[in-house]
Swiss-Prot record:
It comes from Citrobacter koseri (strain ATCC BAA-895 / CDC 4225-83 / SGSC4696). This is Formimidoylglutamase. Binds 2 manganese ions per subunit. Belongs to the arginase family. It catalyses: N-formimidoyl-L-glutamate + H2O = formamide + L-glutamate.
């Protein structure tokens, strides 16, 4: 059975510089920690929600360990300096998947996201494998049945696989099917795609679905297609698979990228989405702390998360 738990207060610790000045603060001092899942108490804030699940990665024959990512990322975020926007973060705890019930975990995340969005919160989910995306995206679609919701995925993989069961490789096919069921258009764009990591069958599926694709080798000039995607929708769900980054910047994922898109380039794309005024939901997925012996990969992911919370308009 899937369960919710508040985040441990021991995760949010860091250096206390408040004796220097009243505004010499770090995230551990400005993040609100909620003892209960009560999004209605935090309207117009950003819900920080963990999805402790890697069952989809296991089903996709990947390297398990992403279930430990939400808490590892909180630790890495905690000691970063708090600037504009960071005091909007409210830690609403973790949804913890109980293997092998991936579908139950995705439904729990879907319900939690819908409830947050309907309470006028925006959602920032820390995965988990990329199976996170179906629960997160479905909750957003449920909350805004009449909006044109655009999905922007920064990822080496299209994740449109055909499979008998949900995996970390199927979330956008599942969301496409959900859009069909809800009789709405499927707006999906994937930036950073590695042609070497996606079969022709996946490429064909993307073409049939009208997916906007920008390959990893073309992301230096991705601002124009990104602007077109942003202009074409009402609300945006941004999902960042950390394997979009090069292996030398992000080795701690299930499938490290041989080429990837450098962090500085990814940050420019993310900033454009954050500044659009349309960003409603974001997640970072596939971080695997088992392969982060020195903590550097967690710091890379945390820096990206810090930038999102800071720049989110």
């Amino acid at each position: 059975m899937t369960q919710w738990q508040p985040a441990s207060p021991t995760l949010w610790q860091g250096r206390d510089d408040s004796a220097e000045a009243a505004n010499a603060l770090r995230l551990f001092q400005t993040v609100t920690r909620s003892p209960t899942f009560s999004p209605e108490m935090y309207r117009e804030k950003i819900a920080l929600l963990g999805f402790a699940c890697d069952e989809g990665v296991k089903r996709n024959q990947g390297r398990p360990g992403a279930a430990g990512a939400p808490d590892a990322l909180r630790r890495a975020l905690a000691n970063l300096a708090s600037h504009h926007g960071h005091d909007r973060l409210v830690d609403l705890g973790n949804i913890i998947a109980q293997a092998p019930d991936l579908e139950g975990a995705q439904q729990a995340l879907r319900d939690a996201v819908r409830r947050c969005q309907q309470a006028d919160m925006r959602t920032f989910v820390l995965g988990g494998g990329h199976e996170t995306a179906f629960g997160h995206g479905a909750g957003l679609l449920d909350a805004f049945p009449h909006a044109r919701v655009g999905i922007i995925n920064l990822d080496a993989h299209l994740d449109l696989r055909r499979a008998d069961h949900a995996t970390s490789g199927t979330p956008f096919r599942q969301l496409a099917q959900l859009c069909d069921e809800q009789q709405r258009e499927f707006h999906y764009a994937c930036f950073g795609v590695s042609r070497a990591a996606n079969t022709q069958a996946l490429w064909d599926e993307a073409q049939q679905r009208g997916v906007t694709i920008v390959e990893d080798v073309d992301c230096d000039t991705a601002q124009a297609p990104l602007a077109q995607v942003i202009d074409s929708v009402d609300k945006i769900y941004l999902t960042i698979d950390l394997d979009v980054l090069p292996a030398w910047e992000m080795p701690a994922v299930s499938a490290p990228a041989a080429l990837g898109v450098p962090l500085a380039t990814v940050m420019r794309l993310v900033d454009a989405v954050c500044r659009s005024g349309k960003l409603q939901a974001v997640d970072m997925v596939e971080f695997n702390p088992r392969f982060d012996d020195d903590g550097n990969a967690a710091r890379v992911a945390a820096r990206l998360g810090w930038q999102i919370a800071h720049g989110w308009r």
